[in-house]
């Protein structure tokens, strides 16, 4: 019997080629646009494309000047504070980068502002005067609510600062957010109740270690922003994370369309998501192959 010995160098080359081919196949996965659409941060359209302005914004969904649900991002350069103002409707705000400083009342006093680092959540209550800004760090907010989200300025008060109005803002730093541990993930309901009718805002963290949901659908659209980590998402009834899931990095934004089948989760790192929608967000399992 003749034995053919393959040189170690060729064996290693073949192994590397196979690994690269496998990785390429995995990353070449696509999702069904009827079930899910997404944008990576480099695909966002900013008001100031040069990003030189002190403040900048991009609308992800809806129209803040209209009357329906809207979602947009405001970002700020360091060292700026706005004037006191209010909005006609509640606004729900997640700090997605840097840190914001927030206060209430007509006297803008940065020394009495509350620092909200990345991962914090706040509510601007309707008709209540508040102000915010940045100090040494930049800041970015993801803001959601029902429009119009008009910014109505009020005359700036003359000091001294008298304590503001505690009913104007609801503020939660990351350590104040209450989480519920589930199998493979943890959730925090920030606004509303996903099981009931009405607007809800929820944080969901998929835990690392190949934790995934199985194919399912929801009765209403859901809007997802990746806060940190890499989120893996797929569509259709075939559950195959190794070959059919796409990776969405932090800062990406996606829509899961109503009654369309999808699945998602995390691989080798936690994936933290912000989910916004109108309930109920019932999870309906899909039948394989249908």
Please identify what each model-predicted range represents:
Residues 2-14:
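Bacterial N-terminal signal peptides that target proteins for export
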Residues 13-23:
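Bacterial N-terminal signal peptides
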Residues 27-70, 151-200, 288-290:
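A short, N-terminal "cap"/entry segment at the start of jelly-roll beta-barrel domains
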Residues 57-60, 71-80, 109, 188-189, ...:
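N-terminal post-signal-peptidase region of extra-cytosolic proteins
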Residues 63-66, 100, 106-128, 193, ...:
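Short acidic-glycine-tyrosine-enriched beta hairpin
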Residues 77-80, 87-107, 208-210, 217-239:
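Glycine- and acidic-residue-biased ligand/ion/polar-headgroup-sensing regions
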Residues 82-84, 102-103, 124, 129-135, ...:
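Short beta-strand His + acidic residue motifs that chelate non-heme Fe in jelly-roll/DSBH
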Residues 126-149, 247-249, 258-282:
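Ligand-binding loop in jelly-roll beta-barrel domains
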């Amino acid at each position: 019997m003749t034995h053919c010995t393959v040189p170690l160098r060729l064996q290693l080359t073949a192994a590397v080629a196979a690994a690269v081919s496998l990785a390429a196949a995995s990353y070449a996965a696509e999702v069904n646009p009827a079930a899910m659409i997404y944008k990576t941060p480099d695909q966002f359209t900013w008001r100031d494309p040069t990003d030189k302005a002190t403040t900048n914004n991009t609308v992800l969904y809806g129209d803040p000047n209209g009357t329906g649900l809207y979602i947009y991002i405001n970002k700020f350069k360091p060292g700026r504070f706005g004037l006191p103002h209010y909005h006609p409707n509640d606004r729900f705000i997640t700090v997605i980068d840097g840190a914001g400083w927030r206060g209430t009342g007509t006297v803008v006093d940065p020394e009495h502002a509350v620092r909200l680092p990345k991962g914090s959540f706040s509510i601007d209550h309707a008709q209540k005067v508040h102000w915010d800004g940045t100090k040494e760090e930049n800041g970015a907010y993801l803001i959601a609510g029902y429009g119009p989200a008009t910014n109505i300025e009020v005359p700036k008060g003359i000091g001294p600062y008298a304590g503001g109005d505690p009913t104007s803002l609801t503020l939660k730093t990351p350590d104040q957010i209450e989480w519920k541990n589930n199998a493979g993930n943890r959730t925090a309901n920030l606004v509303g109740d996903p099981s009931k009718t009405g607007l809800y805002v929820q944080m969901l963290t998929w835990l690392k270690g190949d934790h995934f949901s199985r194919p399912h659908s929801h009765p209403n659209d859901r809007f997802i922003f990746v806060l940190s980590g890499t989120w893996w998402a797929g569509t259709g009834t075939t559950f195959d994370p190794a070959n059919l899931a796409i990776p969405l990095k932090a800062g990406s934004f996606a829509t899961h369309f109503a009654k369309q089948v999808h699945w998602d989760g995390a691989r080798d790192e936690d994936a933290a998501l912000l989910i916004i929608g109108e309930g109920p967000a019932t999870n309906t399992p899909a039948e394989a192959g249908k």
